[in-house]
Amino acid sequence: MARMKKALVMAVAAVAAAGVALAIAGGALAAERTQITVKDSGEFPESITSTKDGAVIFGSISKGIIYKAAPGSATAEPWIQPSSGNLKNVLGVFADERARTLWVCSIVRPVPGQPEPAPDTALKSFNLKTGAFKKSYDFPDHKGTCNDIAVAKDGTIYATETAEGKVLRLKPGASKLEVWASDPLLASADGIAVLADGAIYVNGVRTGNLVRIAVKPDGSAGTMMKLETSRPLSRPDGMRSVGPNTILLAEGEGRADEVVVNGEKAEVRTLRGDFKDQPTAVTLVGKTVFVLEAKLNYLNDEKLKGQDPGPFRATAVAYTPSKQ
């Protein structure tokens, strides 16, 4: 009899535990993130990236700090300090999960009214899990604007250089960056992505161009072509590849887009078009696109400089890929 009672108690406990687990899971789904807020002030994040487990990582132009929101968290906390790897002003960030590496664009941003600082542009790498500094790769003569990053299937790293319209390359195992492509079509090169065709796609933040660069069998840059977009792009910025021929794109004029490439054409579909504070970056977590608004006018507009820009956030936008 005692054994039967004990078995009954254990069964009831198991059912209760299962109910609690289901309740927790349901609560987690109900509490799905609608925004991720950076826990700081005046940081001016310009780029975001994410990992498959749902962590979201932010850079910081003004403070050089890298912030991280844990999976499911609606708050991004300081994670990597500028003293780690001698970070300066952070632009692009990219999570390379295959290499277990976070790639970071670090530049020195001139401050109006102050002496021109010595250039110190570099692509830096950190351990994606721990945040520990790994290595720094200087841009030629330490000059230029390292803006954003993409990684090819073979592990080659590509980074845009905005000031002179270039794409730099770091081959697997290489110790130095090299200029891979330079052309007037790449003027104001900003966002970058790699699609299944192996080509490199680059936009121009000032030109509105979306350019495809073929990769030759020896790895050198091949034919370069400006794609015909279904509508003009206005201040295109950060891009992320999310399918064989699909890119997510932030437009500084207030939109987050899906771009589907088909031959020489690119179909642009606006996912949301009412952002007020200059979207500069996107990242996909599950079926949600997080769109970062950088509020760069508070850095660049004399009328707004010194005013409080308020908190910086990435906003969730539901995403269903286009049928192709």
Each model region followed by its residue ranges:
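A short beta-strand motif characteristic of beta-propeller blades
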Residues: E32-V38, T75-S83, A132-F139, K176-D183, ...
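Beta-rich, blade/repeat-based domains predominating
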Residues: K39-V56, I61, S84-V108, F139-I157, ...
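Short loop/turn segments immediately following the C-termini of beta-strands
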Residues: I61, I107-R109, T162-A163, V205, ...
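Short, solvent-exposed loop/turn segments at conserved positions within beta-propeller repeat blades
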Residues: S62, P112-D120, T162-A163, V205-T207, ...
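Structural signal for beta-propeller blades
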Residues: G64-Y67, P110-P112, L123, G165-V167, ...
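Short loop/turn segments that connect beta-strands within beta-propeller blades
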Residues: A70-A74, N127-G131, K171-S175, A214-G219, ...
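Asp-box/WD-like beta-propeller blade repeats and closely related beta-sheet repeat scaffolds
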Residues: P117-D154
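Beta-propeller blade signature
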Residues: P119-K129, P309-P321
